Amino acid sequence: YSILAMLFPCRMTILGDRMQTMDEKQQDVTRFLPKIFDRKVRKLEMNKSYRNTVEIAEYARALSGDQELELLMRHGKGVTEQTFVSKEALLDQVLIDVNLEKYETVAILTLTEEDALTVCQILKDRGENYHYIDRNTSAFEKGLTVTTFYLAKGLEFDQVFTAFFHRDNPLYKQAAYISATRALHELFVCQT
């Protein structure tokens, strides 16, 4: 923000979801923005969720602890949480669930790039079609997408599967929240 203030000495609109901060604790940037921009900052809170079904939004709200979030009353399937004995077993179930609904956009979201590449290799070995999104990807395609939770920020998918192999990761809670908020219609929280 300091660099932006120096490069662009103008009025700015900064939008974001404080629950999606990429560190171990949620930070409200409006607390330190006045110091950076050396002026008064006007804060508007938008608390209505339009993206997800009620079931997914309630799940995300429980993860974040943000009880002020107002939900759009569009109901869908409940969130499915499953633990698997192996990565392969997890992906077996993901592929079954993907083929049941035939959504246009489906994502398998992982904690790390290494995990995403592992998922890609397993899918490739099984002859599955998928798209991998990394830092250099410039286009979004329909179908099955594999990427990390942090590269999925700003994207939305009809159906989302988390493939979390490391629950002890300090970013687990943020990863779970960000992944949940990417899902429009169905969310499967899968881990080993």
Residue ranges and their predicted role:
Residues 1-192:
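Conserved helicase motor core of SF1/SF2 NTP-dependent helicases
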